């Protein structure tokens, strides 16, 4: 239950920020957020990361929907037993759902955070959730999964089968 609340809160935050930006900043407009560091730039993104799948919004929507279901089941079925692992998956789920809502309803994703001190893509709250959750899930799996969940490694299982 707390993971559903966390996911819902993050999706709500993502949608609120997107609403505020799209209703208060003209398309392509800029508003300083942290002067000389980050500005809000209203951008309508029709592609995936690194301009992949341009002109295939339906495919991005389908992929987002499938991933949302898979991640939801993984959290619900406790793919990671430890709360840290489930929180990581919940972050990725919230990000997937946040961007899925935009793609399904508008055909594009509203992006707004523009980092000024380096050449980087404009992104949104959902993207932050996906990246932070994905990194956390990888760190958890690589460094803590076996220790915290008490499961043997793939190599141990393979050796036992011989």
Regions found by a protein language model. Give the residues of each.
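Alpha-helical transmembrane bundles and membrane-interface segments of multipass inner-membrane proteins
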Residues: 1-162
């Amino acid at each position: 239950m707390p993971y559903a609340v966390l996911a819902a809160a993050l999706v709500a935050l993502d949608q609120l920020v997107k609403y505020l930006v799209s209703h208060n900043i003209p398309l392509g407009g800029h508003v300083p957020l942290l002067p000389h560091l980050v500005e809000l730039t209203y951008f309508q993104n029709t592609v995936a990361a690194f301009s992949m799948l341009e002109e295939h919004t339906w495919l991005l929507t389908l992929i987002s929907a499938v991933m949302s279901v898979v991640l939801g089941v993984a959290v619900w079925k406790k793919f990671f037993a430890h709360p840290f692992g489930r929180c990581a998956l919940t972050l990725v789920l919230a990000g997937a759902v946040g961007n899925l809502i935009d793609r399904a309803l508008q055909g594009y994703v509203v992006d707004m955070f523009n980092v000024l001190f380096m050449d980087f893509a404009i992104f949104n709250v959902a993207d932050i959730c996906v990246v932070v959750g994905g990194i956390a899930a990888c760190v958890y799996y690589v460094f803590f999964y076996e220790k915290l969940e008490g499961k043997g490694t793939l190599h141990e299982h393979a050796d036992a089968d011989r």
